[in-house]
Amino acid sequence: MKQSLLDIILENKGPSKNEVAVTKVPSTPHDQAEGVVKGVLQVCDQAGVNPSKIELLYHGTTVATNMVIERNGAEVGMLTTRGFRDILHMARHKRPHNFSLQFDVPWQSKPLVKRRNRLPITERLMPPTGDIDVPMNEDEVLEAATLLKKRGINSVIVAFLFSFLNNQHEIRAKELIKSVHSDAYVYASSEVVNVIREYERFSSTAMNAYIGPVSYTHLTLPTSDLV
């Protein structure tokens, strides 16, 4: 991840008017939170304000956007209903040029989840009520979690058909994955975006997992350093 500059603005409410201090510090790609904390301490020192007196901290970042553009997000694994692992590949068949084979389809050539990491799980819910037609095979979930851990994949999504009607299988699968791979970031599609239509739900969850690990560490600021 390339280095850039962080803009830090401090507004200090005075008795008659608000005072504003501004500073810039280099970003710290190895640990984005480090640069933010450094910038806050620097602008507080510049304004003569005790960091512990900060009441509200707003934070805006393009870290997630840059990860998507530069294609350097997390390696993602996926557990999905057997027979439906190619939903992320097919999408909605909307293409830039419907009848041309000579163009790039980004979600196929640069998928958020590589096909080999999309693992099918035997389970099935039925609309319109979400009743369980085929119980989830928990052994398959454990085997899939073990395989993804062996591959060094620490960001995993669980995306089952019709989970917006009943997320029982997804939540249980998430628990099983964590029991095998406790350090993994695990996202259930029904928790990320609980909407009808599989592609929209699956792809949104995949995007969340793609940017999630780095974004999480970036947003988990060591506030103890500000006291």
Locate each region found by the language model.
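A polyampholytic, Gly/Pro-enriched intrinsically disordered region
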Residues: 203-216
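Active-site phosphate-binding/coordination module
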Residues: 74-130, 189-193
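Conserved small/polar residues in nucleotide/adenosyl-binding loops
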Residues: 217-223
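Gly-rich Lys/Arg/Thr-decorated short loops/hinges at beta-loop-alpha junctions or inter-strand turns
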Residues: 16-23, 112-132, 198-206
